[in-house]
Regions:
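Transmembrane helix boundary and interhelical junction motifs in multipass membrane proteins
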Residues: 39-52, 56-80
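Juxtamembrane non-transmembrane "cap" segments at the membrane-aqueous interface
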Residues: 76-103
Length: 147
């Protein structure tokens, strides 16, 4: 007897396998989706990925699937890593808020700094993961098209 999880897994895998278009078209779509999935815009990542896939003429279905890199199981590690990468690029310590007395202006400043670090780190990690995933998918579809 098959479980519901096996059927869903097979459907998703067949959806990935049965995409038409050139390898570059499919790779662009997935890369845009992975890039969009690295940003902390919960609920809008798929919309952003599909929007940008339409702009660059990439595969919309693979763009939507690429945003699944960010899911409830990966939110905390992914965004923590993105924040740390952003902190490295901005080169300032991230825990200075505990050393100060909490004033509203300080909270706004810390929120702005936190957001900038997270978005910068998300951009860097997103570009790297998009390049890696896009390259892998390009070669997968290139090999598939030769068969």
């Amino acid at each position: 007897m098959r479980s519901k999880r096996d059927i869903t897994y097979k459907k998703i895998l067949s959806l990935f396998r049965n995409q038409n278009g050139s390898p570059f078209f499919n790779a662009k779509g997935l890369a845009i989706g992975v890039f969009s999935g690295c940003f902390p815009f919960f609920g809008f990542q798929t919309l952003i990925g599909v929007f940008f896939a339409k702009i660059v003429k990439g595969n919309i279905v693979l763009a939507a699937m690429g945003t699944w890199i960010s899911n409830p199981f990966t939110y905390i590690p992914l965004y923590y890593f993105n924040y740390k990468v952003g902190s490295i690029f901005l080169n300032n310590s991230s825990n200075k808020i505990l050393e100060k007395s909490l004033v509203i202006d300080d909270l706004w400043k810390q929120g702005r700094i936190f957001s900038i670090k997270l978005l910068l780190g998300s951009s860097c990690v997103g570009i790297l993961l998009a390049l890696i995933c896009g390259t892998i998918v390009f070669f997968i579809y290139k090999i598939k098209s030769k068969r």
